[in-house]
């Protein structure tokens, strides 16, 4: 029928269908790059990742910097400015410093500031937000970027061990509300995650060490060989030897990436969240202590608790459980906290269930690299596990 | 290697890779249901869509109702309460009335109210938000639901023609900020979209008619036969004959659904947005007139303008352009507004570009069902097109 063809006015309309069901899929790409001195003008990485190819107007860019990173690297804003002088890259329109650590996720002003800068500088869906910082700042800034214009392009420059091997790899973001961690957030895939080794050099010893608990977690869940690698390098990692730390950080990032891209549930719609091993108590511990315990430390304690619990319910052998706990200690991480003994910690079980919804699903260990999901936790056994760790 | 196997301490770590790239895809399902009297306890649809199967705790539900819908149907909250008394459905925990129309998207209190209710009533990712209303309320409530716990389940009950054939079908949501339409939002797929014909019966004549401009738009873009169907039924549609309107509404919803699920770009990452035909001026017209023009009316005017523009740049024949404009008029829709003649309307071109980013991309018509993307708009031709419509 031609484009001016007409049906007769008496035609029967197509029978109306009551049910329209359609399945579809969407494709995503996840780029993760390790480098040194990404802002050095001789480093080609940024041109490779976000180079401007002269098609359409030159895109804009705003940079958002974690105050903690800025304090340790006062020259960073100038280095960012110098790098984006390059006409082959997006045009830098503003550099904003935002509070680092959990404040970034607790203070709604951080998201507001970034949204307002996106508006003021006309950052559109082809333009960029570049965030430089730790996991909390990346989470909060990422939420702003993902919701402005339904998603402007985000490049995450992960500046902590925790961010480089875990937090910045994920495809989610979020902020805290109503006193609950990550109450608000969404799933989104960044344009790229850049892990610059130089940024780790100015971390405090405490922040350096805090990151490696997530590596132990991934080893417990995914790869017994990887626990060997951590174990064999633990003392040198604690002493911040970059050659010992580098392969541990990269392998963790890779395992995390593959969990998302090859695990079959990138946007966490299934019941289980295996990567949250040790996290029910960790989240709660952070909030009970008003974040005096870092996330990495809380995760270390949470791993120790759920590993010992796994032993007490006859899953993992004592020698293996002790091995996990020993690695954490050798990395300079805590495996116990007084708050584990009170009633308050147990509220973390229900909070954890509620965030995910449906049945409680907690990951335990049948062995190293052999996770198992359970749907009940016995508070008395939690207390006994805490006692064994004290 | 057994689970307590160890590598030798002198082993060579795996060579660190600088670049980790992984592609992945995610699967989605889109459910669209047409029915009558969905809240009648004898209607099995809700049990079919969101029935509770006794696995895990009974999920919760909050209902959010558009004030416009509530004003026209004061018994609605009670009907919702009665329906969800059914133990085979989620448990209703609160029904909230929120301002209808564009106020829902302009007033940040609407999103806040819904987030706060999600927190108070412990609505988790397995629980539900049910929104009853027009496109604007569905957009704002959807944004809250999509970002709480990174997405609680949402069922959209579309109560207007515009929502049933267009707004509620999309996989996005959003609110206005900084005086810009949809500045904040995200992509998300609802659990289901329910179109209840009974809800349309209490619409004002103006709101009834406003919905059909999107049907003409879809016909212009996708399906010349569908324009025949609208044309042949236009007079009866204007008079609100349900038998003439039903197939037009359902076919539009179906074309819209297939655009999303089969068009290859469900989350609009490509440059073109063909479904936004006529929308650059429509969005601007709404904002210039402070929403005195409804979205559907503005879209009708925008379609007429871009169709006439297409003729003036030698794309569509005059007779075909006139046919589109005539259908709009016969549906009782406006095709002209005084504000089309000023400078102010032209700012809509840049606003439209900015929201999408990159090059300007405007859809014109080479014929009915034959859209074409262009990257430039001549302001003088816009003015001549407006003159021809006045």
What are these regions (language model features)?
Chain A
Residues 2-10:
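Short, Lys/Arg-enriched N-terminal segments with co-localized hydrophobic residues
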Residues 12-127:
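ATP/NTP phosphate-donor binding region
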Residues 142-236:
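A glycine/threonine-rich phosphate-anchoring loop and its flanking beta-alpha core
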Residues 16-20, 25, 213-216, 315-390:
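C-terminal charged capping/lid subdomain of soluble metabolic enzymes
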Residues 123-155:
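Active-site and donor-binding regions of nucleotide-sugar-utilizing enzymes
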Residues 232-343:
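Active-site segments that bind and position negatively charged phosphate/pyrophosphate groups
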Residues 55, 121-124, 147-149, 176-177, ...:
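Solvent-exposed alpha-helices and their adjacent loops that cap or buttress functional pockets
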């Amino acid at each position: 029928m031609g484009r001016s063809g007409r049906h007769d006015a008496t035609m029967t309309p197509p029978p109306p269908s009551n049910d329209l069901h359609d399945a579809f899929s969407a494709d995503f790409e996840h780029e993760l790059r390790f480098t040194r001195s990404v802002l050095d003008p001789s480093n080609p990485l940024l041109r490779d990742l976000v180079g401007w190819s002269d098609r359409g107007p030159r895109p804009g860019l705003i940079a958002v910097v974690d105050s903690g990173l800025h304090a340790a690297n006062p020259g960073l804003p100038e280095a960012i400015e110098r790098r984006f002088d390059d006409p082959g890259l997006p045009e830098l329109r503003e550099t904003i410093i935002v509070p680092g650590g959990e404040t970034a996720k607790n203070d709604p002003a951080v998201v507001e500031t970034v949204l307002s800068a996106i508006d003021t500088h006309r950052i559109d869906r082809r333009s960029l937000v570049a965030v430089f910082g730790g996991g909390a700042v990346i989470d909060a800034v990422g939420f702003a970027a993902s919701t402005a214009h339904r998603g402007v392009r985000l490049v995450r420059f992960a500046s902590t061990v925790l961010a480089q091997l875990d937090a910045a790899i994920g495809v989610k973001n979020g902020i805290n509300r109503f006193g609950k961690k990550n109450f608000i957030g969404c799933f989104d895939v960044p344009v790229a995650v850049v892990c610059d080794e130089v940024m780790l050099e100015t971390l405090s010893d405490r922040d350096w060490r805090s990151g490696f608990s997530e590596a132990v977690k991934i080893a417990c869940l995914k790869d017994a060989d990887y626990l060997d690698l951590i174990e064999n390098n633990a003392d040198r990692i604690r002493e911040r030897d970059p050659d010992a730390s580098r392969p541990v950080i990269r392998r963790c990032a890779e395992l995390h990436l593959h969990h998302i891209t090859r695990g079959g549930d990138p946007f966490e719609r299934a019941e289980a969240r295996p990567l949250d091993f040790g996290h029910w108590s960790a989240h709660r511990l952070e909030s009970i202590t008003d974040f005096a315990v870092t996330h990495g430390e809380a995760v270390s304690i949470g791993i120790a608790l759920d590993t010992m619990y796994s032993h007490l319910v006859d899953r993992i052998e004592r020698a293996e459980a002790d091995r996990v706990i020993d690695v954490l200690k050798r990395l300079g991480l805590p495996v116990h906290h007084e708050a584990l003994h009170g009633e308050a910690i147990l509220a973390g079980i229900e909070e954890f269930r509620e965030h995910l919804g449906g049945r409680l699903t907690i990951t335990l260990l049948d062995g190293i690299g052999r996770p198992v999901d359970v749907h009940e936790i016995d508070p008395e056994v939690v207390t006994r596990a805490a006692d064994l760790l004290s």
